[in-house]
């Protein structure tokens, strides 16, 4: 009896950059043997906008509106790292009230980011119902952002030395109401998702990363903590006022896609706990340190008529960055978001290097999808949680 011939020819498939499950303009060149993945090559750069070079030709205040376009689902964190870099470089003190407001906004933004990860992730796996529930809760967070900052997404709220405006009257009560409501919502998500056998079949044991691999690849955030590494910059670096609150680092030891899901769900609960404590302990006082505003020195104090027409009477609140260098980081929803800043005794940074967590975490994707099925690519890529605006910069 003749045996059937085995297929030796491989198929090369382009996934993206327009595929809806690519979470942006990501392109994957996938080599397949039937349904089995032999190789996967991510192609990046479709959303590159030169964010680092733009920063080196702007003052920090002028650059703030740009940074919300990195990770446009967690804009508070990109603003926070942008103002933290010059604050640490020049040793600028932050009023206690401003620090508490920052913590509240950062944790609300973390919840919103995790929600917008969870909805499309479940949709990629074939579950449409959680997608609509999650957008309902996310709109409540955006209502809080709009009331405090005037914008629902691109907030432009953080300032060097504090925040742009104080919390409006009645905002704290609305935030507490949301916290109570959302805690019940998380329990609903768990009942709806965690007990679903189809969901468990798709994520359990898929995309395994050991703790040693996670460290060697430089992973951070839920990708690192889901592999058994208890590393959270809010505990390690003690920035803002996180050391004044009682909360725990959420982690899992399994290292698969299910563990990454559980870490993010648990982080949303911890964020609610931090917000409630911050609202309870929030002090009075100023919301911005106005003394940090060092106005640009005019080289020639006697302006002629032509220059006066084009220069406003009140210059923008710029200040010089001294000739130093430092690296500053925050714990963003997707991992460690860092800035390497080099000052040069001028208003513009000499070097502004962005360390995006999504770009680093994405590098392990080819290793995770090899020897897996084609359908598992969506599960693994979704569990990494990337935003291409941040990856390409």
Swiss-Prot record:
Gene Ontology CC, one term: chloroplast thylakoid membrane
Protein's recorded name: NAD(P)H-quinone oxidoreductase subunit H, chloroplastic
SUPFAM superfamilies assigned: HydB/Nqo4-like
Chief location bin: plastid
Protein's job: NDH shuttles electrons from NAD(P)H:plastoquinone, via FMN and iron-sulfur (Fe-S) centers, to quinones in the photosynthetic chain and possibly in a chloroplast respiratory chain. The immediate electron acceptor for the enzyme in this species is believed to be plastoquinone. Couples the redox reaction to proton translocation, and thus conserves the redox energy in a proton gradient.
EC number per UniProt: 7.1.1.-
Entry membrane topology: Peripheral membrane protein
Keywords annotated in UniProt: Chloroplast, Membrane, NAD, NADP, Plastid, Plastoquinone, Quinone, Thylakoid, Translocase, Transport
Catalytic activity: a plastoquinone + NADH + (n+1) H(+)(in) = a plastoquinol + NAD(+) + n H(+)(out); a plastoquinone + NADPH + (n+1) H(+)(in) = a plastoquinol + NADP(+) + n H(+)(out)
Pfam (any one): Complex1_49kDa
Naturally occurring in which organism (per UniProt): Festuca arundinacea
GO annotation, biological process: photosynthesis, light reaction
MF-aspect GO terms: NAD binding; oxidoreductase activity, acting on NAD(P)H, quinone or similar compound as acceptor; quinone binding
Enzyme class per UniProt: translocase
Oligomer and partners: NDH is composed of at least 16 different subunits, 5 of which are encoded in the nucleus.
Family the UniProt entry places it in: Belongs to the complex I 49 kDa subunit family.
Disulphide bridges, residue numbers: none
Cell compartment(s), UniProt: Plastid, Chloroplast thylakoid membrane
